[in-house]
């Protein structure tokens, strides 16, 4: 919100500098982004009166004699297409500074002396987007009353101070000059002074010319007035200046009045050309599928049933709350104007403007809320301005569909409630003074008082809101700083916290680096690596499609991080993350998703760099599985790895599901080469675990065993197997032999080559046996090996080599 300091002073009698005002506003709840003075950096710019203007043959140039208040006219060569004799212009005399600190000097153009420059607004630093179209390709023409030789700043209000406010959604009341005036008046204990317009109505009633109706629950009220015999022309200079300083391009007096009212009241308005209506009844309804509308910017908009439209003769003529239609726009020939003031549902307007990527000053205000109490006042004010600036005749009364409550909202609390929360010792008299400054009504006493909150402050509805207002006006800097009086409370980590801490420590001990990725991603990535995808939970109003859906897996976000690092030549990565995924078993539009803690990691590149002693070693499936084995061993959990080809984004031959108590709790494996290519990453291995399942399976008590003094015995066994037999199947077969003295199974060799028949492989294991209470004998171990050999032969078809 851009606030004119000059305009603000007309509404509130304050005697402070713009800088002091900005600082005070920032400390009381409305942040000031900065202050801009349009004239800053400009100098020696004066009013000039073009006495004569002669075309220079065979050029686009004009030789002008300009009165700049000096004894003799000043000769200036100008190339602007709209320069002519008799107009008042902006002249930069030699030594002047214009935009970009450019200095004007005497010079010669085509051999003709030029003692200055006739300037356009662009050359003064104004943006093309706010300059009136009639002057966008030429010089600015000043009002006839401008005096030659005077500094031009006061005529264009370039000496104003423009205060830029950063308005948070809860303070949308400050998206209007009246709202800002109320705020400033409360800060300084002043009163507001709003000008009144003398509206004179004709004998003809508005209801004779127009009728309005509402056919949607998303329209709270819709009101109109009619102004006849309007003369469309450029707005007076003061109004154009005000709009340009607010970042709005002046169009004509009718459109400019609606924009002025928007800035002044915060009430969006629209003006229709009544003579372009095919009917005299306006109906506001939801658009129908397949309908379209050409908006004022010339774009054809395809509408949906979620859009609101203003219709005449059942045809859309405006996109409600967003932008008017081209078919009924005001032009130079318009004579009868229909003014619209309405309140539309903010969510509906936000959805339409977001879908069409069509943001406007009007849609912004409807999205955040408007003051119900001034809808009709703003409508009357606009009609009175058209009467004044366009010489229009205002029909009596207005037509309205839908009623709004304009009564103050009553909120009750007590003095103790306020002081306890602020740590203050305010008296009831202090409370009365503060709410009087705010312009709020107050009844009751310190034991119970009720505040009547005007409709202009629709952000206040509960006692906590009153406390905030008291703190703001009293002064945040005056609130006492106290330390909590309560003593420390002994506590311990919850099981969830303890598990997270332990897993984090193990992961970092294994060389993984923690990252935090976005919980919001694209709908496609949200379910990409999910073992059991559920209903997708999507945001209704995402900032972008890249952050529009809640993730159902951790891996896709981690791969984004891998891709980011790989693109910057960092390809040896070992990352982990502990975070939440979001599962939705029911309707995501009606119920919140379940939040489940997950642990995931990813590794890629080299696990060992090449040097004079070591060969380079790339990560593989077993490195990823080794990380998990270490994790499960430290958690005292026993899992199974089951090969799977069902995960579309994982390599079908290098991926396994992880089972705990016969339940799938995660997966580990290589990212599918196609998926890796889509992410622009090298060969990458990932794993993801359900930490809630891990927590549920953790043993409640930790059992300690005495370290035995008896030695262990080791036996090696080499097996000839079919290539399809997995390591997990072999381990399962060995364990099924039921040898309770078997304490460790270690695979130490895998071989496939010329000495092994086709379709076969050799796997060698080291088996460790130990009796904690006695020495083992060779005979005992031999019996154990016979049992194990039998189990391997029967279950996996192994042949002992």
From Swiss-Prot:
Record domain tRNA-binding: where: 39-153
Domain B5: 406-481
An annotated GO BP: phenylalanyl-tRNA aminoacylation
Regions crossing the membrane: none
SUPFAM superfamilies attached to this UniProt entry: Anticodon-binding domain of PheRS, Class II aaRS and biotin synthetases, Nucleic acid-binding proteins, PheT/TilS domain, Putative DNA-binding domain
Any one GO cellular component localisation term in the record: phenylalanine-tRNA ligase complex
Principal cellular location given in the protein's record: cytoplasm
Subcellular location: Cytoplasm
EC number: 6.1.1.20
Cofactor requirement: Mg(2+)
Name of one Pfam family that matches: B5
Top-level taxonomic group: Bacteria
SMART domains: B3_4, B5, FDX-ACB
Stretches assigned to the FDX-ACB domain: 708-801
Keywords: Aminoacyl-tRNA synthetase, ATP-binding, Cytoplasm, Ligase, Magnesium, Metal-binding, Nucleotide-binding, Protein biosynthesis, RNA-binding, tRNA-binding
Molecular function terms from GO: ATP binding; catalytic activity, acting on a protein; magnesium ion binding; phenylalanine-tRNA ligase activity; transferase activity; tRNA binding
Binding sites annotated in the UniProt record for Mg(2+): 459, 465, 468-469
Gene3D superfamilies: 3.30.56.10, Bira Bifunctional Protein, Domain 2, Ferrodoxin-fold anticodon-binding domain, Nucleic acid-binding proteins, Phenylalanyl-trna Synthetase, Chain B, domain 3
Matches recorded under PANTHER family: PHENYLALANINE--TRNA LIGASE BETA SUBUNIT (PTHR10947:SF0), PHENYLALANYL-TRNA SYNTHETASE BETA CHAIN AND LEUCINE-RICH REPEAT-CONTAINING PROTEIN 47 (PTHR10947)
Family: Belongs to the phenylalanyl-tRNA synthetase beta subunit family. Type 1 subfamily.
Record's subunit section: Tetramer of two alpha and two beta subunits.
Name assigned to this protein: Phenylalanine--tRNA ligase beta subunit
Organism this protein belongs to: Streptococcus pyogenes serotype M3 (strain ATCC BAA-595 / MGAS315)
Gene: pheT
């Amino acid at each position: 919100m851009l606030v004119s300091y000059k305009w603000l002073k007309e509404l509130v009698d304050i005697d402070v500098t713009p800088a002091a005002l900005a600082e005070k506003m920032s400390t009381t709840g409305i942040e000031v982004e900065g202050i801009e003075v349009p004239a800053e950096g400009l100098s020696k710019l004066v009013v000039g009166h073009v006495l004569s203007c002669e075309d220079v043959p065979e050029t686009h140039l004009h030789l002008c004699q300009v009165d700049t208040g000096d004894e003799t006219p000043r000769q200036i060569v100008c190339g602007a297409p709209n320069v002519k004799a008799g107009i008042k212009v902006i002249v930069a005399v030699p030594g002047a500074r214009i935009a970009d600190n450019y200095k004007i000097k005497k010079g010669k153009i085509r051999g003709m002396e030029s003692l200055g420059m006739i300037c356009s607004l662009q050359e003064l630093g104004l943006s093309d987007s706010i300059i009136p179209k009639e002057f966008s390709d030429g010089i600015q023409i000043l009002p006839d009353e401008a005096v030659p030789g005077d500094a031009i700043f006061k005529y264009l209000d370039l000496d104003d101070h423009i205060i830029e406010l950063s308005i948070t959604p809860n303070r949308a009341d400050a998206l209007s000059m009246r709202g800002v005036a109320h705020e400033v008046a409360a800060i300084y204990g002043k009163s507001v002074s709003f000008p009144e317009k003398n509206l004179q109505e004709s004998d003809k009633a508005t209801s004779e010319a127009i009728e309005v109706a509402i056919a949607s629950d998303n329209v709270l009220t819709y009101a109109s007035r009619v102004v006849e015999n309007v003369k469309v022309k450029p707005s007076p200079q003061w109004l154009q200046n005000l709009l340009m300083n607010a970042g709005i391009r002046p169009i004509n007096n009718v459109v400019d009045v609606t924009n002025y009212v928007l800035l002044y009241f915060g009430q969006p308005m629209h003006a229709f050309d009544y003579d372009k209506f095919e009917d005299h009844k306006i109906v506001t309804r939801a658009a129908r599928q397949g309908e379209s509308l050409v908006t004022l910017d010339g774009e054809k908009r395809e509408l949906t049933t979620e859009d609101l439209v203003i219709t005449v003769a059942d045809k859309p003529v405006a996109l409600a709350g967003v932008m008017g239609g081209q078919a009924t726009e005001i032009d130079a020939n318009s004579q009868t104007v229909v003014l619209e003031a309405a309140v539309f549902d903010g969510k509906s307007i936000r959805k339409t403007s977001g879908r069409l990527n069509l943001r406007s000053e009007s849609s912004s205000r409807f999205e955040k809320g408007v003051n119900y109490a001034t809808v009709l006042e703003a409508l009357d004010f606009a009609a009175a301005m058209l009467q004044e600036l366009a010489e229009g005749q205002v029909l009596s009364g207005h037509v309205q569909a839908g009623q709004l409550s304009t009564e103050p909202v009553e909120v009750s609390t007590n003095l103790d409630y306020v002081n306890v929360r602020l740590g203050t010792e305010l008296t009831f008299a202090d409370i009365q003074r503060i709410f009087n400054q705010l312009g709020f009504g107050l009844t009751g006493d310190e034991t119970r008082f009720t505040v009547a909150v005007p409709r202009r402050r629709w952000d206040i509805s509960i006692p906590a809101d009153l406390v905030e207002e008291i703190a703001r006006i009293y002064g945040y800097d005056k609130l006492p700083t106290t330390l909590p009086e309560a003593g420390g409370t002994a506590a311990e980590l919850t099981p969830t916290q303890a598990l997270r801490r332990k897993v984090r420590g193990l992961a970092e001990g294994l060389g993984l680096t923690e990252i935090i990725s976005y919980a919001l991603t694209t709908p496609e990535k949200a379910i990409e690596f999910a073992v059991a995808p559920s209903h997708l939970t999507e945001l209704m109003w995402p900032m972008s499609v890249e952050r529009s859906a809640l993730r159902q897996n951790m891996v896709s976000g981690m791969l984004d991080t891998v891709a980011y690092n790989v693109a910057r030549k960092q390809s040896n990565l070992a990352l982990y993350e502990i975070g939440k995924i979001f599962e939705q078993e029911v309707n995501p539009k009606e119920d919140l998703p379940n939040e489940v803690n997950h642990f995931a990691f990813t590794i890629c590149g080299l696990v060992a760099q090449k040097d004079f002693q070591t060969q380079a070693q790339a990560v593989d499936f077993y490195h990823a599985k080794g990380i998990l084995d270490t994790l499960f061993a430290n958690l005292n959990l026993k899992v199974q790895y089951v090969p799977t080809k069902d995960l579309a984004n994982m390599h079908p031959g290098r991926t396994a599901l992880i089972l705990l108590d016969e339940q799938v709790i995660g997966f580990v494996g290589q990212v599918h080469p196609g998926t890796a290519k889509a992410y622009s990453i090298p060969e990458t291995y990932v794993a993801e675990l359900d930490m809630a399942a891990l927590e549920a399976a953790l043993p409640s008590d930790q059992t300690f065993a005495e370290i035995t003094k008896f030695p262990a015995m080791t036996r090696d066994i080499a097996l000839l197997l079919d290539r399809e037999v997995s390591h997990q199947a072999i381990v399962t077969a060995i364990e099924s032999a039921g040898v309770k003295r078997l304490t460790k199974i270690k695979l130490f060799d895998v071989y496939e080559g010329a000495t092994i028949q086709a379709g076969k492989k050799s796997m060698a294991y080291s088996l460790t046996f130990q009796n904690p209470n006695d020495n083992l004998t060779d005979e005992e171990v031999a019996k154990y090996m016979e049992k194990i050999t039998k189990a391997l032969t029967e279950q996996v078809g192994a042949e002992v080599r």
